[in-house]
């Protein structure tokens, strides 16, 4: 089940007035992008619908909590929308961060006089009250207490609701407040990241509020997030279908006209490309793939004792197929050359970039891959004691990545995904460390493990409460790679047929980039645990059992195209 925090609605008349969150904008102005088809134009065609992004909001109601940083505000589009565009639902967010969200407004692309099928947008036939903060016998709240009422639009047959409507009175909204969308123009969405749980004043009925996202978020997924929220009075599982509740929009325009062209891609990278900073004590630095191949990397085949040198561009590597575990890449046999290659070559290193559609082509994901010839040993933190695990965590070759998600309406950076071992996290633009005078973020790579983090410091993979886990140390240094200038675009499938973006041969190598390594780590850790007093051994053992599977061994890592996020969405 999704985790949630229960907040009680209270009459907070005596609390001081709250300040509305400030609207966030990137620190530097967004440039004029090179000419193209639809990228950065402000509108996107989804086939039968045209949508615009609304970021100018009118405040409706605030869920006020006595707990700091847990207030939630609800908004609707401010003023009149452009001609023929209609609101699809309201927006909400926490007051603890700047106002940054959006909702989509839509218009029917088919003139009503020319329509031979049902219109794409219609008014709901009614509204159903889902929940109210005022469930007492009183009809209305006072002007000071400000109650909130949550309404679900009831669509006609063959249509779907896209969002909820919030009011401050018990009077039903006007039917023209929102529009419902024809069912064939919608896609399935799912709840994601519960925002808050509100509890009504007298009866204590809870309301769970989530963000939503399309269920199919892969590179070719058609689902489009409308920016609305989902709510109901019982908890739902993380991936439960919202059923008859609300839906996402669907992009039926196969041309993906709002995606950037080659010139616009180059401009985006040069404007937003982060600087990747390595730990000052990093031993195992990145290199280019060609440097790795030129300096003695070999191809190994199961059952064949002869190791084959690899061409500079990887043209003699097995191409396509899947990881059948018959081949792997290894370091040179010569010990001196092996140690030399392990340390990488920062001067040759670059970021390898994959460009792909996201959220039905309304966003562009720029996926930045960094290659390191070797991944160093882990450090185990047991309270105040740090223990180098010597060999545990080591493996040949390491592919890590971070992803920039950019709005195709404007070309604005919205968030960055930072991969961290077997998972990762999305960091909103307002939480990034930005290089002064630019819109370029700083991404920190952890010592030896090369996981990505938003700031310098120590991040624990394990139990932060007990201080037990694998350390991920990041720090400022002069060991850095500026991805806005040192990059190579390796793939953009939606631009098929563009010879400028031909994929390198090594990208088609779907097998392992290193031999399998097996550690005796669990026995080593058990010996360490036994050194501690019996009073803490049970807690230690419980946490250590949850540590990454990498502590038991390392399968040889696969290349970028074999990762599930190449075609799918990021894991979080």
Curated annotation (Swiss-Prot):
Q: Which InterPro entries match?
A: Vps62
Which stretches of sequence are listed as region Disordered?
551-572
Query: Cross-referenced Pfam families, in alphabetical order?
Result: Vps62
Spans of biased composition, class Basic and acidic residues?
Answer: 560-572
What is the protein name for this chain?
Hypothetical protein At1g04090
Which species is the source of this protein? Arabidopsis thaliana
């Amino acid at each position: 089940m999704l985790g949630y925090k229960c907040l009680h609605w209270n009459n907070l008349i005596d609390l001081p007035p709250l300040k509305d969150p400030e609207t966030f904008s990137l620190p530097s102005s967004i440039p004029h992008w090179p000419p193209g088809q639809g990228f950065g134009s402000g509108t996107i065609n989804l086939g039968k619908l045209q949508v615009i992004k609304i970021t100018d909001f009118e405040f409706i109601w605030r869920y006020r909590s006595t707990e700091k940083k847990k207030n939630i505000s609800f908004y609707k589009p401010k003023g009149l929308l452009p001609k023929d565009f209609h609101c699809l639902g309201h927006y909400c967010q926490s007051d603890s961060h700047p106002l940054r969200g959006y909702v989509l407004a839509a218009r029917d692309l088919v003139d009503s006089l020319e329509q031979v099928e049902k219109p794409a947008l219609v008014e709901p036939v009614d509204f159903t009250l889902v929940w109210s903060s005022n469930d007492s016998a009183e009809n209305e709240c006072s002007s000071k207490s400000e109650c909130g009422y949550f309404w679900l639009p009831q669509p006609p047959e063959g249509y779907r609701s896209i969002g909820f409507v919030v009011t401050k009175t018990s009077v039903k909204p006007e039917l023209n407040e929102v529009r419902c969308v024809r069912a064939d123009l919608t896609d399935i969405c799912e709840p994601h990241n519960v925002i808050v749980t509100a509890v009504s004043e007298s009866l204590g009925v809870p309301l769970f509020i989530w963000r939503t996202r399309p269920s199919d978020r892969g590179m070719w997924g058609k689902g489009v997030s409308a920016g609305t929220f989902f709510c109901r009075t019982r908890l739902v599982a993380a991936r439960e279908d919202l059923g008859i509740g609300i839906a996402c929009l669907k992009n039926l325009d196969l041309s993906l006209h709002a995606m950037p062209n080659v010139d616009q891609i180059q401009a985006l990278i040069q404007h937003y490309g982060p600087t990747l900073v390595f730990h000052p004590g990093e031993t195992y630095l990145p290199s280019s793939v060609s440097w790795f191949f030129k300096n003695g990397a070999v191809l190994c085949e199961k059952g064949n004792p002869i190791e084959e040198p690899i061409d500079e561009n990887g043209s003699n590597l097995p191409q396509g197929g899947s990881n059948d575990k018959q081949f792997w890449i290894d370091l040179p046999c010569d010990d001196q050359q092996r140690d030399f290659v392990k340390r990488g070559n920062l001067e040759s290193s670059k970021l390898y970039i994959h460009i792909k559609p996201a959220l039905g082509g309304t966003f562009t994901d720029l996926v930045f891959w960094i290659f390191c010839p070797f991944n160093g040993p882990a450090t185990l933190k047991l309270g105040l004691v740090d223990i180098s695990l010597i060999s545990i965590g080591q493996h040949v070759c390491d592919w890590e990545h971070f992803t920039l998600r950019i709005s195709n309406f404007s070309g604005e950076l919205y968030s960055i995904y930072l991969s961290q071992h077997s998972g990762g996290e999305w960091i909103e633009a307002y939480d990034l460390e930005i290089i002064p005078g630019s819109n370029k973020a700083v991404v920190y790579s952890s010592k030896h493990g090369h996981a990505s983090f938003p700031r310098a410091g120590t991040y624990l993979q394990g139990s932060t409460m007990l201080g037990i886990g694998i350390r991920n140390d990041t720090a400022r240094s002069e060991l850095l790679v500026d991805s806005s200038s040192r990059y190579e675009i390796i793939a953009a499938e939606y631009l098929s047929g563009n010879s400028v973006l031909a994929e390198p041969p090594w990208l088609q190598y779907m097998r392992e980039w290193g031999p399998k390594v097996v550690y005796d780590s669990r026995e080593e850790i058990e010996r360490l645990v036994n050194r501690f007093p019996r009073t803490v051994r049970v807690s230690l053992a419980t946490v250590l059992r949850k540590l990454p599977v990498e502590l038991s061994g390392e399968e040889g890592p696969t290349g970028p195209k074999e990762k599930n996020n190449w075609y799918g969405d990021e894991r979080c």
